[in-house]
Amino acid sequence: MKNLIKCPVWFLGLLWLSACTSSQDHHSNSAQPSSNSVELKQAAAGMVVTANPVATKTGAAILRAGGSSVDAAIGIQAVLSLVEPQSSGFGGGGYMVHFDNTTKQVDVYDGRETAPKNVSADMFLDQDDQSIGFIKAKTSGLSTGVPGMVAMLSLAHANHGKLPWGEHFADAIKLANEGFVVSPRLHMWIERFGKYIPRDLKEGTLDAANYLLDANGESIAVGSLRTNRDYANTLRTIANNPRDFYTGDIAKDIVQQVQQTPRAGSLSLQDMRDYQALKKSALCASVGDLQLCGPPPSSSWVAVGAMLGLLEFTPEFSSRADKDPKNWTLFAEAQRLAYADRDHYVADNEFVDVPLLGMLNKDYLRERATLVSVQRAKPSIAPGDPWEYQNSTAADTLGKDMTDDVAGTTHFVVVDGEGNVVSLTASVESVFGSTRIAGGMFLNNQLTDFSFQETDDQGNKIANRIEAGKRPRSSMSPTIVLDQDGEFLMATGSPGGNSIIAYTAKTLVGVLNWKLSAQEAVNLPNMVARGDKVRIEKDRASPAIIQGLRDYGYTVKESAGENSGLSVVVRLPNGQLQGGVDPRREGVIEVVDF
């Protein structure tokens, strides 16, 4: 039995209509289908939550065939790479957090891209040591790191897969050959990004223009069918042997595209061959009776853990929960404190010492929380000194890094019939990555997540500076929460660039602190407090909340909308699963009964 929540109307009349079941059709001018939380009828059931209906359908089908959560994740990502190319793909990378319901172990699979061996620390600077600008950096070969997604999924499958690896690509291959339907969101991003798509070889390669625009140079239309046979061929190769992605013709194609002018990159075949995905122990924060777990650096998940940890020691939330402006000011202050430390300390900890234990130490968080006043916001927030709580000293004095990582990302959650959970965030960095295509895939521009400068204005080294073989700092923060008995309680995560940290923390606060349902937590207004300003969704936040933030002393920017794409699953006390999917995107939830 299945229950697919809200099928957007642009699927009506199309070849996969039978996958969509809903009590009513939904359509809005913003192409953002709404959805409601779903509760399962039995604890043994599974759930899939993704940002795209076709990907959700694929994941659910794999679960019904006896696949694990990791098996489903492989099929989901193969489809998302095709139908949501603005967000993620096999030309990019990501992080997977996995909960094993037998061992109760939480592990992390790190598929973050790496910088080439011959990378230059000043590659994004001009002859005057000034930045060449984000768009020039993005639409270049300089911006592409070694893609890690295929290696990460292969490693996870070796440990947790139940079905043969090659079976998981069938849906994506069929869609690539026969055509997928261009969704409103894909069309919207082509429209928005259109002016940056290189249309002259002096600006960059013409890959994106040829794929995303029609013969008249206009964005491909909503509802039109788009084939991608190069991608189908790539998938066949990966399905046969994932290692061929890094050693064979696909690798050669990737290197050739990266090394094209203008602004050619240094990525080599040796860089491709040398790439390794990593299996790591999850980084966990104790918050009350719970364990909140996510990826260690180069992910910035430590800031998510710190936000929830700080709230243990700030003045208590009032019983009015999300309705009380004071509660939002407390959450904003926790964000500011956590972002300040993240911007200062976090980078690939294979290259830089990161005081992770100190940043999550309860005594340190208690000390930092004393900076929070119930009366008035501090004009500015400086990073703290977690090294005192790390039982070691800093190797270097580090400079502040406010580098943005732009919102071209996706997140999904899968719970299989045995209770194993995947929380996975994937990205090509900015929208359509570098705009260069190899093997039918958009190649990432993840190296723009590094600081363009090696030092700050005071001459201090920046932790997230460019170095050969290094993984750039990421905001991707897939999260799994365990209850007091070590059982799965919640999985969450989001796209959204630097705002991912705040978006993800919002759902944790909503469910764990304010006792909201998964969907209610997703629907809360997104608020991001990084630095000295607060940004909040004006159409979702009440006037009282916005005014309360101003009264507290913040400079508040009311945003027309935020680029989150939250996918959430919560296990209720009776063992049932409850899902939440972001109405700001096109995602759906599918329940799988076994």
What are these regions (language model features)?
Residues 279, 406-409, 474-476:
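Short, small/polar residue-rich loop motifs at catalytic or cofactor-binding pockets
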Residues 313-427, 560:
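Internal maturation/activation junctions in enzymes
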Residues 26-57, 69-240, 245-247, 252-299, ...:
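Noncatalytic scaffold domains of N-terminal-nucleophile
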